[in-house]
Amino acid sequence: MASTQHTPTELEAAGDLVLPAADELAGRFPLTPNAHPATPEEYGEIMSTLAFGKKFTDHMAHMRWTREGGWSDRGVIPYGPLELTPGASVFHYCQSVFEGIKAYKREDGSVWTFRPGYNAARLNHSARRLALPELSREDFVASLVDYVRADVKWVPDVDGSSLYLRPFMFASEEFVGVHPAGVVDYYVIGSPSGPYFKGGLSGVAIWVEREYHRAGPGGTGSAKAGGNYAASLLPQIQAEAKGFSQVCFLDTYEGKYLEELGGMNMFVVMADGVIRTPELTGVILEGGTRNAILRMLRDEGVDVREEKIALSEVVDGIRSGSVAEVFACGTAAVVTPITRLAGDDFDVEIAVGDKTREIHKRLTDIQWGRAEDPYGWTYRLA
């Protein structure tokens, strides 16, 4: 039966709230120009290579929170090293959360982003879980607006490339002792970036991890916390040594149900047209790209199911043909076909499918302004 009823999640509802226009928010983070910006030669080299997340722009947005005074010291300042003592609590207790969002340059030279309200809501969700302070969505979006306007020349105009934005906050108070920090810093940095996976829609090979888990029930799995990603690095290294691009993690209880990749959500396209994705259990990240895909599919009348998906179902389905496509999604890679799925006792391959291509095209066309945005997801920054 096709999905007809859908109750928005808390993040989805918060992300759909109408934001003030960028011009109304501009100026909240006053600019202190960088006296030593990248030279023309350095700038040219960076913009001609566009490696993902390797180089950064001339400035960064910043504000600070204290228990006594709340958020203050807003500004766009020169990019450079941070002053932290070895006693800064983030080094000891991992109070740190982040977001990932992109700025796209359209053909007319304008710069847009995708669902910043959703990212603002998710940052606050993550902050609550790690006992960090929340910030207003206006401050969050204003930090993007003022930062991008200061460094707008760093937004690539190459198709498929973008200025990858990394808002993050961390506990910077100096102490050793297990309690929430009374001083927290928030920053936005940006990296001119090409595609996350160089192969594009050619597909990636995924190793299914049985020994290690990304997160567990009651933990921080639904938060975009740095520690979750640190926990994925060892199995990622081991998978890469076997020739795989990413790791798929299974549930901690039974070790049989798909959860997510190290940094992306998963979808399974059945041959009968049903599209499935692992349900939100508080363990996996509620991805903005995942949510957008679900909404588009539901509006098309597709039978979309958020449910437990056993690994054995997928492997057997690929072998029998009842599973037609498998793909992953996230801000960095958008939509990526999974063309090989392997583990200790199985190894199956599957072709890139038409539905994956269609979803990728529809989503990126909205993001880049090549198609109508019926949801109001795109937001002009500059």
Segments predicted by a language model, with ranges:
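Helix-start/capping segments and mature chain N-termini
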Residues: 2-143, 147, 175-382
